[in-house]
């Protein structure tokens, strides 16, 4: 700024006083003079206006920077919180997956045990049914054999024995039958 004023005074001092006021056709010289005058007026009269304008602009810029920093900090906090929540959700998902695998394994073992038990019960029931049917068939065959034997014995005893001998043989056969036939067979 002092350079400008120095230049103005240098130019004014080089001018002769006799020339006075007039029309200067040198564009470069007149522009410098005009600029110097305008700047001088602006610096003296509008200094407070420009200072307050620059201060307001500086405050607005600083406020914008502070707001941007605050928004950045909030965004960083939200990002960190979201990352923490994501990690927590990931851990919970891993735990749920591990628990479901464990539960599935336990259910599989339980089902296999139930299948084994049911198979064993079915085999036992099958064997019991077979044994029961065998006993039933044997019992039926015994009855038929005994009945046929009795019929034959009676027929033979009628033809060969007298009454007294028939009674004795009959009692003996009844006694033998009583021992052979159990209460379940009747």
From Swiss-Prot:
Chief localization: plastid
Pfam families: ATP-synt_B
A GO term from the CC aspect: chloroplast thylakoid membrane
InterPro entries assigned: ATP_synth_b/b'su_bac/chlpt
Keywords: ATP synthesis, ATP-binding, CF(0), Chloroplast, Hydrogen ion transport, Ion transport, Membrane, Nucleotide-binding, Plastid, Thylakoid, Transmembrane, Transmembrane helix, Transport
Transmembrane domains' residue ranges: 27-43
Bilayer topology annotation: Single-pass membrane protein
One function term, GO molecular function aspect: proton-transporting ATP synthase activity, rotational mechanism
Subcellular localization, as worded in the UniProt entry: Plastid, Chloroplast thylakoid membrane
Keyword ATP-binding: yes
PANTHER family tied to this protein: ATP SYNTHASE SUBUNIT B, CHLOROPLASTIC (PTHR34264:SF3)
Role: F(1)F(0) ATP synthase produces ATP from ADP in the presence of a proton or sodium gradient. F-type ATPases consist of two structural domains, F(1) containing the extramembraneous catalytic core and F(0) containing the membrane proton channel, linked together by a central stalk and a peripheral stalk. During catalysis, ATP synthesis in the catalytic domain of F(1) is coupled via a rotary mechanism of the central stalk subunits to proton translocation.
Self-association state and partner proteins as the record states: F-type ATPases have 2 components, F(1) - the catalytic core - and F(0) - the membrane proton channel. F(1) has five subunits: alpha(3), beta(3), gamma(1), delta(1), epsilon(1). F(0) has four main subunits: a(1), b(1), b'(1) and c(10-14). The alpha and beta chains form an alternating ring which encloses part of the gamma chain. F(1) is attached to F(0) by a central stalk formed by the gamma and epsilon chains, while a peripheral stalk is formed by the delta, b and b' chains.
Something else known: In plastids the F-type ATPase is also known as CF(1)CF(0).
Family under the similarity heading: Belongs to the ATPase B chain family.
Protein name according to UniProt: ATP synthase subunit b, chloroplastic
Organism listed in the record: Mesostigma viride
Name of the coding gene: atpF
């Amino acid at each position: 700024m002092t350079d400008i004023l120095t230049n103005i005074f240098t130019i004014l001092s080089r001018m002769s006083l006799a020339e006075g006021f007039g029309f200067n056709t040198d564009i470069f010289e007149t522009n410098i003079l005009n600029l110097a005058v305008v700047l001088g007026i602006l610096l003296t009269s509008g200094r407070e206006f420009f200072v307050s304008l620059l201060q307001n602009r500086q405050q607005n810029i600083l406020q914008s920077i502070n707001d941007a920093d605050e928004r950045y900090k909030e965004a960083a906090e939200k990002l960190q919180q979201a990352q923490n929540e994501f990690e927590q959700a990931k851990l919970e998902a891993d735990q749920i997956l591990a628990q479901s695998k464990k539960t599935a394994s336990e259910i599989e073992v339980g089902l296999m045990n139930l299948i084994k038990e049911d198979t064993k019960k079915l085999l036992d029931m099958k064997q019991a049914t077979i044994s029961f049917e065998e006993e039933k068939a044997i019992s039926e065959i015994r009855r038929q054999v005994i009945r046929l034997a009795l019929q034959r014995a009676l027929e033979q005893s009628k033809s060969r024995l007298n009454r007294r001998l028939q009674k004795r043989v009959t009692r003996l056969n009844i006694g033998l039958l009583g021992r052979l036939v159990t209460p379940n067979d009747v």
